[in-house]
Amino acid sequence: MPSAVVEEKINSYRPRVVERLASAGEMLAARQEMGGNTPGNVPPWPGSSDADFHGSLAAVWVWSRAQQVLGDDRFSLNIASAWNFIESSWAEFIPRTLGAHASDEAAYDCAMVLRAWLAGGAHSIDDESARREHVVQAARLLGAYITDLDDLTGREFKDPGFLVWTLGDYARASNDRGLGATARRFVEAAFGMKSPPPFASEMPVRDGLFDFSCTTATRVLAVIGAEGPIPFVGAWLRERVASALPQAFVPRPMDENTWNACAAATLGYAFSVATDTTFFDAYKSLMDELDLRAEVGSLGRTTGFSGETSATFYYAMATASILGKI
């Protein structure tokens, strides 16, 4: 497709992206704790005071992306406070190794450290800073975890697609060839370049507490993360992935808003790489429904739930993805 047509479609969404990210940022800023025992923490839902490590990192991602599209620094205090919370509570959430003793969420926590760092332009921070040391530690832990990962059936916090996608993006941004090779080896062995199954055929979680990650979508993101948004990957998306895209919002018994937002984030980003209207049309179909379900930039896990930090993060990713920012 001619680049002018692609730009026209992307730019048609730009005002909506600015509005949604600004609203999501304001909601999360209002939720953030600025005093008490955990200053800087962003609790997972209204009325909660739980310390939420990856939720606070998700908020950093939203605020950072919002500032980029707004062209100002209105959330800079929120970002700094959230990073202070992350650094002060690091030992509580991030173990020395991601072995059997680590929590089920530890690998995801490491990945979210990297996603927040990537979104915020924090790679300009001095390599000797404590934050940079924590980012490097999270990357090394995640790389070792992925190297030893045999179970490809993980969902939610253990979704290998999300973890490898994040590691690949980080490796490219930090020019870490070793971690980049780790991501590529995993993708080649676990996923390859075969056609994924239809997104809508993905089985729901039956016995868990969450079903927020569309693992078919994150597998696609893992390939893009490992290889980069290059023409070869664009051809793969057009030839092998386009036929698997959902044609409408996919009903799910649990976390259907977040699951569809995860899928939409992949479709929007893939459109910027593949430049094929099949991806744009599928993206628009999901986003039209998600926009109806969202309230002032905030999204609940499913119908009837109030705005939740994680669901809002995935909705914000979906919103921004059409600009190639994810």
Predicted features along the sequence, with ranges:
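Short, charged, amphipathic alpha-helical segments
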Residues: 76, 80, 181-184, 284
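Non-membrane alpha-helical segments in proteins
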Residues: 48-69, 109-119
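Residue-level detector of extended alpha-helical repeat arrays and alpha-solenoid scaffolds
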Residues: 56, 76, 110, 160, ...
